[in-house]
Amino acid sequence: GIIPCGESCVFIPCITSVVGCSCKSKVCYKN
């Protein structure tokens, strides 16, 4: 992913995964 979703995933998974975001380097990115 290259677009930051404005969410971290250090302690919990990406809630924004419902819109296509995934965790990378402790930050949620959209592919």
Swiss-Prot record:
Entry keyword set: Disulfide bond, Plant defense
Positions bearing the Cyclopeptide (Gly-Asn) cross-link: 1-31
Disulphide linkage map: 5-21, 9-23, 14-28
Disulfide bond is among the record's keywords: yes
A biological process term (GO) from this entry: defense response
SUPFAM superfamilies: Cyclotides
Signal peptide region: none
UniProt keyword ATP-binding, yes or no: no
Domain of life: Eukaryota
Post-translational modification: This is a cyclic peptide.
Recorded family membership: Belongs to the cyclotide family. Bracelet subfamily.
Record's function text: Probably participates in a plant defense mechanism.
Free-text note regarding domains: The presence of a 'disulfide through disulfide knot' structurally defines this protein as a knottin.
Name by which UniProt lists this protein: Cyclotide vpub-B
